[in-house]
Amino acid sequence: MTRDEFDAYCKSLTATTNVVQWGGSSVWKVGGKIFTICSHWGPVDRDCISFKCTDHSYQVLCELPGVVPAPYLARAKWVQVQSNETLTDDDIKSYIEEAHAIIAAKLTKKQQRDLGLLPA
């Protein structure tokens, strides 16, 4: 998945905002809280996608080649996909959507309603 494809997909999710920070990283948020990042963090010389995941997904994904605990964020169960061969674009989109849902669920009910994540 290219950075442009990553940004386009994240933009399509409900109530998302984007900021470029931390050395040019594309940081996507819902309700002001980060759920995924496309960055050059780590040992590979290309953009890598990092996202929040469930405890189970974290364990499973970290066993795959090309997926590592995300730099600076691993303690919060974030992974970084460093290889395009490990997961398909559809897999990555699914995990990004799950990350969006995980972070959105941590917002207050009022915030969720205000952002259109819950019925009014």
Give a label for each model feature.
Residues 1-120:
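Charge-dense, helix-prone N-terminal extensions
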